[in-house]
Amino acid sequence: MFRYTRFEKARIIGARALQIAMGAPVLIDVPEGITPLQAALLEFEKGVIPITVIRPS
């Protein structure tokens, strides 16, 4: 898996949690009653978040 900096990781998880909170479908099976942030963390750990990081060359 690609190594992200702590800043990239925070931005990816935060952005995905916001998407989930606004009604985006969760891409993995999650237990009922889970928060959007927890769902985003689970997605990040499984590597299924559809967000790409582009670094300058």
Curated annotation (Swiss-Prot):
Entry superkingdom? Archaea
What is the originating organism of this protein?
A: Thermococcus kodakarensis (strain ATCC BAA-918 / JCM 12380 / KOD1) (Pyrococcus kodakaraensis (strain KOD1))
Query: HAMAP family, from UniProt?
Result: RNApol_arch_Rpo6
SUPFAM superfamilies listed in its UniProt record: RPB6/omega subunit-like
Gene Ontology terms, cellular component aspect?
chromosome; cytoplasm; DNA-directed RNA polymerase complex
Gene designation per UniProt: rpo6
Oligomer status and interactors: Part of the RNA polymerase complex.
Protein's name in the database? DNA-directed RNA polymerase subunit Rpo6
Q: Which reaction does it catalyse?
A: RNA(n) + a ribonucleoside 5'-triphosphate = RNA(n+1) + diphosphate
Provide any one GO MF term from the record: DNA-directed RNA polymerase activity
Transmembrane region(s) = none
The answer to whether keyword Cytoplasm applies is: yes
The record's listing under InterPro entries reads: DNA-dir_RNA_polK_14-18kDa_CS, Pol_omega/Rpo6/RPB6, RPB6/omega-like_sf, Rpo6/Rpb6
Gene Ontology annotations of biological process type:
DNA-templated transcription
Coiled coil spans: none
